[in-house]
Amino acid sequence: MLRRDAWRQARFVHPRSYREKILRSLFFALTARINQMRRLDPEEYPEDPIEGYDRFLEIVREYAEDPDYDSPLLLLYESLSAAYAIFLRGEPVHPPGTEFPGVGKVRRTDDCYYCPIKERREDQPGSFCTLCPAEQDPEVVS
């Protein structure tokens, strides 16, 4: 059911070959993160308020109110995965290796993550990019 909802949400992603590739990549990351969360010790949760979390919840609400985004279950899993990646792991929403056609891939060098589309997406309403720890890839002109 989750996979079906993701395919329906991704119907506007073209070309089809890219849609298939990115969905495989994102499902792999989603599954891996859910398994990591299941093994997480509650003692490892931050006790102090998390900077950016209120904005994160606003973005989730924007998605929930978007009539084109019609899968509450997919939104739940995507939001949990994104929050876990950003706030607990310090990782980008899109895992390293995620390809954006004609632009490049999310990559990691030492302790820094680079995204080829960060600057393009930061101002887009409802985008987790504003909270993502990845930096704009300096090798990609936005």
Curated annotation (Swiss-Prot):
Pfam families: DUF2115 (PF09888)
HAMAP family: UPF0305 (MF_00763)
Family the entry assigns: Belongs to the UPF0305 family.
UniProt name for this protein: UPF0305 protein MK0666
